[in-house]
Amino acid sequence: LLLQHILPQNGNQALYKVNIAPPAGKKYEVTDGVYAKEEVRAGIEDAMHILERVRPDKVVTIGGNCIVSQAPFDYLHGIYESLGIVWIDAHPDVSTVRDGYPNAHAYVLGSLMGEEGTSLTDMMRNKKFEANEILYVGLQEIHGYQEKFLRERNVGYKIQTEEFVSDDEIKDFTSRFDHILIHLDIDVLDAGLFHSTYFANKELVGDGSGSGKMTMEKLSDVLQCIQANTDVVGFTVAEYLPFDEHKLSRMFSKIGILTEG
């Protein structure tokens, strides 16, 4: 809801809500190695139903974790033949059930590439994405099993702890396609500079991966470079976690003058 108000207001774009299980403060089961597998699959399926009913030619997806890119990117791949993905993320998102990490948000790009070990690939309606159709921007150090996945599938990547991919590299990639999808994981931003990201919460552990290193100014430059040189047909903004705003909300909920009739 907060992201909806942060983004520019655009009366030409209809808003559709994907039905997902609301936070209930409870733990879900790990099924077939996937945490809350039934709920994850139900969200993807509902998103696909909306897309197939509305039939948009462009899709903006906001909210949720990285798994929210699966349905729209798969759908748009069924519309556009020449389609590349710019994956702006501190992490590669190619983990599988075999790697022992149960959270599906880390599986999504592997799933879009047709990796069977995600327990989600069977939900795809269209062909898989190929290794040469993916460009990582902002990628930080990766686990050995992720490196193995990328190497075996010939996915080109550069660890960007010291230097991000250049504008020329982005232009070279986007020039090979008629259309581009952008996946933006907010955790690509430096958690020391931007606090509405997973890694700004010291209580969270995840899979041991680290924070992104990008500044807001650099991210803006990257997005401007992409849109100036290609036709963007899909844009995901994932993993925006407004911890400070949540803390304020909890505090204000206990103030009588704000809650009394």
Predicted regions and their residues:
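Residue-level detector of flexible, active-site-proximal loop/helix-junction positions
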Residues: 22, 92, 116, 141, ...
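Active-site histidine-anchored catalytic micro-motif
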Residues: 58-127, 133
